[in-house]
Amino acid sequence: MASSDALLPISAREEEPLCPYTRLPMADPNQETHGPRRRRPFKGLLAVSFGLLFIAFYVALIATHDGSRSNDEGIDETETITSRARLAGVSEKRNDGLWKLSGDRNTPAFEWNNSMLSWQRTAFHFQPEQNWMNDPNGPLFYKGWYHFFYQYNPNAAVWGDIVWGHAVSRDLIHWVHLPIAMVADQWYDSNGVWTGSATFLPDGSIVMLYTGSTDKAVQVQNLAYPEDPNDPLLLKWVKFPGNPVLVPPPGILPKDFRDPTTAWKTSEGKWRITIGSKLNKTGISLVYDTIDFKTYEKLDTLLHRVPNTGMWECVDFYPVSKTAGNGLDTSVNGPDVKHIVKASMDDTRFDHYAVGTYFDSNGTWIPDDPTIDVGMTASLRYDYGKFYASKSFYDQNKGRRVLWSWIGESDSEASDVQKGWSSLQGIPRTVVLDTKTGKNLVQWPVEEIKSLRLSSKQFDLEVGPGSVVPVDVGSAAQLDIEAEFEINKESLDKIIGNASVVAEAEEFSCEKSGGSTVRGALGPFGFSVLATESLSEQTPVYFYVAKGKDSELKTFFCTDTSRSSVANDVVKPIYGSVVPVLKGEKLTMRILVDHSIVEAFGQGGRTCITSRVYPTTAIYGAAKLFLFNNALDATVTASFTVWQMNSAFIHPYSDEAVRALSRT
């Protein structure tokens, strides 16, 4: 069992950076990984050569660093910011080229004015005061405060110069920005202090593992800890003198080894972590055991692998209860527990997950349903919209698992530079296994978001086929909508029993079937948010119910951003997927609207969609809300409540701001 005395405090003497404990070749990605774990001896010249190559690589890594950023041997500073990110081996903003490939490619970019750009800044979503942010890092609850760290560029509204931003909150809604937690000041992270995770030791102290990009652009894992464990704000962090604690193992490229997870306890009392990587086109998750977080033993087996999924970033691994609606600490295991493996796919920029079984004895995991394994085309996703690099943590304060995610922009980089900021975080979500289906997760905004609700209006409306109804709620830029829909039973029975109604469930797709304007027998129907009076700009969030070949109904939950803005330098996809609807359930949705972000939750959070939208005229008081039913044959009854939402308290760092937040 790890003892905090072995780690905290670390003596002031300079320790040599540590090599990984295991120097075995990488496991064959085609090898069966669910048998007993066996230590294989090195055999023959191949193994000796592999070991020597690894030692040479490691010696070169340590010996050649000069302790500072290298412009001539590291990243080419003459490259654009975008290519800097790709050269470094991480994802960056990819929208600039996309709109130019659309029908607007021959048209000059839209001319945004300051009023439009100012409106895009959110009121109750977390984002830095200015400049660029991306991945959530090391979220935790400590001494009465929620801590949120994040990838941050303090110098510009584009990716680069990454450090760890830091903010604290009492309730996950109201925040105070704190000074930067960790900067790129060592050779092993001089090209960026990248994504990492926090682990609580048995005595309540904290260790933080994070990826550093070295002065030679090699991805290594590093250890840090609070300078003063008695400081509830955790203002200062100390990097372990022996960093890096892990370097890329044999067979792994220098830029394919990043984003360590929160550690969990094994049955032997060791700590275990997993780190994302790839072998050729196969996405993999490496596994390491440690006792003191300084030295590590690499397991011969992989936690999991899926061919043709590419690089796995920001891997997350955690238990969920099969029977209860509460969250579980990361180390919990047992017969009533399933485990989630989630990976952020560098190739597609989607966060995929699967439900499965974890084997503590050899550190492997298998999915319950191999046909929807992590990263496969048909696999499950946390969110079917703009949602990436997510990170969960166990909130011991309320016994729940909370999920954060980076919500990037869908506009051009030039617009980001003009407005002076880029990206934000989604509203934190609770995440549990859907105990009704046992096959998927359910996500829901944390309960604290309700504290921002102001005035509300309730509606019960019957909406006939082809109808659009204005919903009188005043300005619709900051809303929380909870709605329940029911298709008229007579219409439903008539369509199900009518052989002439085309079975379309197998062919329908939110993304490819034309959006909310394409009419079917039973849909689409829902809300148009951030709409102008004339509907020239609108973002529909809707259900589409399709009849299958067996006359069974299949329900889809979609968001159509194709008409969200008349601007031509914006990517405007149609998002969505099928949503499970059980017998006897009505169709339900919740929508959070906060200026340029729309978060939608179908059927209690079984299917979620986050969108970034940039209207040019549906802003300020001109932003409206509409209810619509574009079905051909069905009447729909909608019962819903709309709340106006207050702004969150998100302030710069000062003693007074911290005191004010302490009083909430």
From Swiss-Prot:
Disulphide linkage map: C510-C558
Ranges facing Cytoplasmic side: 1-43
Consequence recorded when altering P9A: Partial retention in the endoplasmic reticulum
Transmembrane segments: 44-64
Positions in the Lumenal compartment: 65-664
Pfam families linked to this entry: Glyco_hydro_32C, Glyco_hydro_32N, INV_N
One GO term (biological process): sucrose metabolic process
Residues that hold substrate according to the record: W132, M133, N134, D135, Q151, W159, W194, T195, R258, D259, E313, D346
Glycosylation sites: N113, N280, N362, N498
A GO-annotated cellular component: plant-type vacuole
Sequence motif Critical for trafficking from the trans-Golgi network to the prevacuolar compartment and from the prevacuolar compartment to the central vacuole, residues: 14-16
Main location: other
Gene3D superfamilies on file: Exo-inulinase, domain 1, Glycosyl hydrolase domain, family 43
Effect of gene knockout: Reduced carbon fixation rates during the day, but increased respiration during the night. Shorter roots.
Intervals of motif Critical for endoplasmic reticulum export: 7-8, 9-10
InterPro entries (alphabetical): Beta-fructofuranosidase_N, ConA-like_dom_sf, Fructan_Metab_Enzymes, Glyco_hydro_32, Glyco_hydro_32_AS, Glyco_hydro_32_C, Glyco_hydro_32_N, Glyco_hydro_beta-prop_sf
Description of how activity is regulated: Inhibited by C/VIF1 and C/VIF2.
Catalysed reaction, written as an equation: Hydrolysis of terminal non-reducing beta-D-fructofuranoside residues in beta-D-fructofuranosides
Subcellular locations according to the entry: Vacuole; Endoplasmic reticulum membrane; Golgi apparatus membrane; Golgi apparatus, trans-Golgi network membrane
Gene Ontology molecular function, alphabetical: beta-fructofuranosidase activity
Domain notes: The LCPYTRL domain (18-24) is critical for trafficking from the trans-Golgi network to the prevacuolar compartment and from the prevacuolar compartment to the central vacuole. The PRRRRP domain (36-41) is involved in sorting to the vacuole. At least two Arg are needed for correct delivery and the presence of two neighboring Pro seems to contribute to the sorting efficiency.
Subunit structure: May be present in two forms, a 70 kDa monomer and a heterodimer of the 30 kDa and 38 kDa subunits. The ratio of the levels of the two forms within cells appears to be regulated developmentally.
Function: Possible role in the continued mobilization of sucrose to sink organs. Regulates root elongation.
Protein name: Acid beta-fructofuranosidase 4, vacuolar
Gene: BFRUCT4
